[in-house]
Amino acid sequence: MAILVSPSNNTGWGLGCKSMYGGARRLTEHHPVLVRRHFRASWGSKRGRTTVPTVPITDDPVADVVNAIAEGTTRRRRRAERRRRRRQATSAMRAARALVRSARRRLARRGRVRRTRNPVADVVRAVEEATRANPPRRSARIRARTVATVNPLGPRNIYWVRDQSGKRIPVTSRPSRALGYLV
């Protein structure tokens, strides 16, 4: 945290992270001075921001107490209204979060070693899976989805084409029908 020299009456921005930024990450006419990597307001621009208590004083002590309590609650309510509220999550956001959680669970599950009552069989199975020459075949839909996500241009059609060895592979550019590759 950068501690800046603040004005003599301490109304300035140099005492903490929240107030130090002054709400400005960009240069404006209100925040003309660059400090480290953010802009702060010029000298004296934050003067007069504090509110004076407006509790009316009466002869009745009960009314004074009621007024003082009411003033505190309204100030607290105003402060709560000024606070930034968290946006209500839409159904799409909730679905995206659920998708991320399930993907994380799947990744964690994949790393776990399956255990049975026979520890020797567990070790043998783990070694076999680690040294298997052909990894387990992924489904065609997962392969196609992977190809689609790698492409930064957005969603595109996926065509299945046979390569030289005769295996079907997903491609995003449509081959010519005259060549007879499309299967």
Curated annotation (Swiss-Prot):
Pfam families, per the entry: Adeno_VII (PF03228)
Induction: Expressed in the late phase of the viral replicative cycle.
Chain location of the short sequence motif Nuclear localization signal per the record: 168-183
Residue ranges of the propeptide: 2-23
Site feature Cleavage, where: G23, A24
Keyword DNA-binding belongs to the record: yes
GO BP: any one term: viral penetration into host nucleus
Signal peptide: none
GO MF annotation: an example: DNA binding
UniProt KW Nucleus keyword: no
Other facts noted in the record for this chain: All late proteins expressed from the major late promoter are produced by alternative splicing and alternative polyadenylation of the same gene giving rise to non-overlapping ORFs. A leader sequence is present in the N-terminus of all these mRNAs and is recognized by the viral shutoff protein to provide expression although conventional translation via ribosome scanning from the cap has been shut off in the host cell.
Protein name stated in the entry: Pre-histone-like nucleoprotein
Natural source organism: Bovine adenovirus 2
Gene name linked to the record: L2
